[in-house]
Amino acid sequence: MTSEHKVGEVGTEIAPELAPDADGATRVDLLLRHVCHLARSLTNAEQAALALQATVDDAPRKYFSLSAAYAPWRDYRPDPKGLGLHGLEIPPGEVIRLTQEEVESHPAWQNFGDQAPEHPPMRGWLATAVCGDGGYRYGLLQLSDKSAGGDFTDEDEVRLRELAALVGAALDALRFSHERAAA
């Protein structure tokens, strides 16, 4: 596997796991929602989001976990477009950590574009790519708003990197299982 793949490949490769159950959720959907909650718990972040790249049969997916402080945004669900900071190509295993000042001065910062009036605030940013075997890119895991107004730490970087690697390995297992079954 190479790290370069067409947008749209993931869905076909883990298709059985992406098929909705009776409630409309998939096992992968549930897993990725839990990943966001776990990422928040590991880093004391108020917000976590995971964007899974577009699949052949489906649009890009985005999963969230928000603290009680962000209750007004619980139903905010934009179409993930991968613009601004969200569109940065973070190499596998690397983490980007920005303070609020660094976010606002970053050349990729777009202040949420046309979503600005509805988008929850973003104070600081910690993000890494979720990659599998050989750098195969699944998506982006990102956190914002460290509790108590603090900045993300070196330890937060380590925890996010390790969680993203675990998620990448889990998605690989699903993808490889489907490939073997299809062969």
Residue ranges, per PLM feature:
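Helix-loop-beta substructure at the N-terminus of cytosolic sensory domains
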Residues: 21-76, 174
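Allosteric cytosolic regulatory segments
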Residues: 161-168
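A short, aliphatic-rich beta-strand micro-motif
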Residues: 123-132
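Flexible loop/coil segments at beta-strand boundaries within sensory signal-transduction domains
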Residues: 56-58, 131-137, 146, 174
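Signal-transmission linkers at sensory-effector interfaces
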Residues: 1-34, 38-42, 155, 170-183
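Signal-transducing coupling segments at domain and membrane junctions
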Residues: 96, 100-124, 145-146
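Acidic/proline- and glycine-rich, intrinsically disordered low-complexity segments
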Residues: 70-106
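Short beta-strand-to-loop transition segments that serve as allosteric relay/switch motifs
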Residues: 140-150
